Amino acid sequence: MKVVVAQKDLKAALDIAQNTLGSSADISSHFVFDLQDNNQVTVMSSESKRLYSCVPVSPVKSTGVGKFTVEGKRLVQAVNAIGDGHTINMESDDKGNVALSREGNSKSKLNYPGLDPDTFPDWATEISSAKLSKALPAKLLTACLNAIKPYVSDDDTKRPELCQAVIRDGKMMATDAYSLAILRSNEFADLDFKIQLKDFPNVLKFLKAHETQDIEIHSTAKAHILKAQDGTTFGFMRSQHNFQNLPAHFLNSFDWTPRRVWAFNKGDLLNSIELLSSGSDKNDFFVTFNHPEDALTNPTLTMDSLTERDSLVEEVPLMVVNPADATQYPLKMVIDRQNAEVSGVDTGSFKFNYKYLKEVLSGLDNNVVFGCSKEGSKGFMLFKNRFDDHDIDMVSIVAWVS
C-alpha cells in the first residue's frame, strides 16, 4: 500500500488526529491509515478507547486497499521537519512496516515498524449504530462550552456526576454544587448531550478546526460522534453517571428580578479581591460584601486580616448605568430592578467564596452585574448574560456562604 500526499495536506490532517493520540506503547500511540478505492484515505487515532478521530487526507494519491499504522509522535515530528512545499511518500510492506520518503530525494528515507491495525478500538460499530440528534454551528457549541466550563466540577473522586455539562430539556447546564450555570437556546431542543470536563479541550480543538461549519451530533448510549461537513469525525464517551436534577426554580430563573442589583467594572472588583486576599490567610477565601439599601457610599468588601487583629476593608466603586446603554443583559438587570417593585428582606450584606466568583468573572466582559435574593436562610448571587450572535440566554448562580 502506498500514499502520496503534499506535506501541508498531511500535516493538516495530523494536526486534528493527534488530539486523540495516546502515549501508551500500543495502538493508542499510533496513527492508523485506512486506504480505500478511488484515492480515499483517512487517518484515525484513539486514546484509551475513550476518544476517537477520523480525518480525511485530501488531496491524495493511494495504491492498494487496507490499513497500516505509524507511531504518531515520530510521524508528526518527521512531517514537521520536512516542511511545506514537499511531497511525502508512505509505503507499507506486507509485514506492516512503513517507509517514509520525501519525493525527489531517494536518500531521505525513514522506516517505522507498524502494529496490527486490527487491534484498533472498534469505533466503527459505535459510529454505525449512532443516531443523528442535531446539527449545530461549531461557533455556537464553542461559545456555550467556553461559557459553561467554569461551572463544571473537577472533583471526580467525590462527585463524578458533577464533572460534566449536559444538554436536556432545551438547556445546557453544569454545577459544582457551589455555583451553577444554565444556557437556554432553541437550538438545544430535543438534544440529549453529555460532555465530561476532561474532554472539553479536545472537543474545543475539534470545533476550532471546523469553526465555519455545522457539526452533526450523533449519539449512542455510550458515546457522542461529532461529524464535520468536511468528513472529519470525532468521538468521545458519555459519562455513565447521571447528572443531578437542578431545582426547578433555578431552571426557570431567566425571568427573575433579584431583590438587589449592583454593577461594577470587572477590573475594579478583581483588584479589590486581590488586594484583600494578599493580606489574609492563604486558606481563607471568604469575603463579606456590605451595602445596605440606604447607604450613600460605595459597597465594601471585607476579609479577616492575617494577624486577626482587625479586618481588611476595601471599597469598590459602583458603575453608573445609562438606560440607553442597558437594553441587553447584563446591564439590563440594573434597569429591570429600577422598574420593578421592591419587596422582601434587603440582601445587601452577605458572604461569598471569592474562588467561585472569580470563576464566574473569567467568562464575563468588563461589565459585571449581579443581583442577590434570599430564600429562607439561603442566599445567592445571580448573573445574567446574553449572546446575541447565537441567540443564547445564560444565568449563573453563586451560593452565599452560610
Question: Where are the model-predicted features located?
Answer:
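Structural preference for solvent-exposed beta-strand-turn elements
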Residues: 1-402
